[in-house]
Amino acid sequence: MPKKIRVLVIDDSALVRQILSKGLALDPSIEVVGTAGDPYIARDKIVKLQPDVLTLDVEMPRMDGVDFLRRLMPQYPLPVVMVSSLTQKGKQITLDSLDAGAVDFVSKPTSDIARGLKAMLSELCAKVKLASTANVSHWKAARTVVPARLKTLEKRALAESTDKVIAIGASTGGTEAIRKIIAQFPATMPGVVIVQHMPAGFTRLFAERLNQLCAMEVKEAATGDRIMPGRVLIGPGGFHMKVVRSGGFYQVRCEPGPPVKGHCPSVDVMMHSVAKHVGGNAIGVMLTGMGSDGAEGMRAMREAGARNLAQDEASCVVFGMPKVAYEMGGAHSLVSLDSMAPRIVDLLSERRI
């Protein structure tokens, strides 16, 4: 019989702890080994109960979830799924939590509580099971500093790259990976389009946060936005983002639609459009994430002449999307996260005969 996933539920509300515990216990592969009302109690129970995964409330008294994560992860890295409110403050703290090492998050329902609660618990069970397979070992000890922007490569990279498009897809663990890569790009980098699996409301905050950290302009995409050097467009949650050609330039179209491979926005949708309209002028990048979204689109990009990279297993939180993309022939090579930005710049500067 397979070993059950041992979960510790951390929330300051006794009612929420009870609801989450009962919901998780309905899954035969999950065992709730304990609950904690605040991070101080949680710290002791982590040592005593040795859980495989934590669920953690975003906003708590005494110490919020982010501060707890920042203290926990360097000493005792564990996969953590955040339970978030959809308030503006809750969204901000959720993104802080992902930066601090949380694997994923679920949002508490705000309307139609009965139906919303059932959906949230189902999502929580799925994400706890995914989190149990996540690689969080790189959080052990001191966190690495984001490398300096690649200023010395800037002039060389620009030689033949003014009409290039860089298309990046990511899911679980992707926010941190994207930040590390984009923060190294110079302001004159070719246009970048990104699909990160994330609900509506979170993508705008994610873009705003990246915009404060990066030399490039970063914004949540809207239909009609031009793809141009120095700009990064993040696909909005709840909309598929497609790249189209309009005269002499590229722009994006953001449209609602059914989930593709379970996601909206979908990496496949974006990459298929890049294959069709950008072809050999594109570079594709597949980062950490569960599942296979983007693998077919990346293969189409390669067949259209694009050069593609996928994140390697050792640096992924979840080696799913990059693995499938590489195995299906979409990615030319597997690259570590630390080497990804320099490798992209190298590809931009290569002459193609």
From Swiss-Prot:
Q: What keywords sit in the KW lines?
A: Chemotaxis, Cytoplasm, Hydrolase, Phosphoprotein
PTM sites of type 4-aspartylphosphate: 57
What the entry lists under SUPFAM superfamilies is as follows: CheY-like, Methylesterase CheB, C-terminal domain
Whether Nucleotidyltransferase counts among this entry's keywords is: no
Q: Do you know which Pfam families this protein is assigned to?
A: CheB_methylest, Response_reg
Response regulatory domain: which residues?
6-123
- InterPro entries attached here? CheB-like, CheB_C, CheY-like_superfamily, Sig_transdc_resp-reg_Me-estase, Sig_transdc_resp-reg_receiver
| E.C. code | 3.1.1.61, 3.5.1.44
Q: Is Nucleotidyltransferase one of the keywords UniProt gives this record?
A: no
Cellular component (GO) terms are: cytoplasm
Q: Where in the cell is it found?
A: Cytoplasm
Determine the domain of life of the protein's source.
Bacteria
Q: Name one GO molecular function term.
A: protein-glutamate methylesterase activity
Query: One GO biological process from the UniProt record?
Result: chemotaxis
**Chemical reaction(s) catalysed:** [protein]-L-glutamate 5-O-methyl ester + H2O = L-glutamyl-[protein] + methanol + H(+); L-glutaminyl-[protein] + H2O = L-glutamyl-[protein] + NH4(+)
Posttranslational modification, per the record? Phosphorylated by CheA. Phosphorylation of the N-terminal regulatory domain activates the methylesterase activity.
What does the UniProt record say this protein does? Involved in chemotaxis. Part of a chemotaxis signal transduction system that modulates chemotaxis in response to various stimuli. Catalyzes the demethylation of specific methylglutamate residues introduced into the chemoreceptors (methyl-accepting chemotaxis proteins or MCP) by CheR. Also mediates the irreversible deamidation of specific glutamine residues to glutamic acid.
HAMAP family annotated for this entry? Answer: CheB_chemtxs
- Record note on domains: Contains a C-terminal catalytic domain, and an N-terminal region which modulates catalytic activity.
Q: What is this protein called?
A: Protein-glutamate methylesterase/protein-glutamine glutaminase
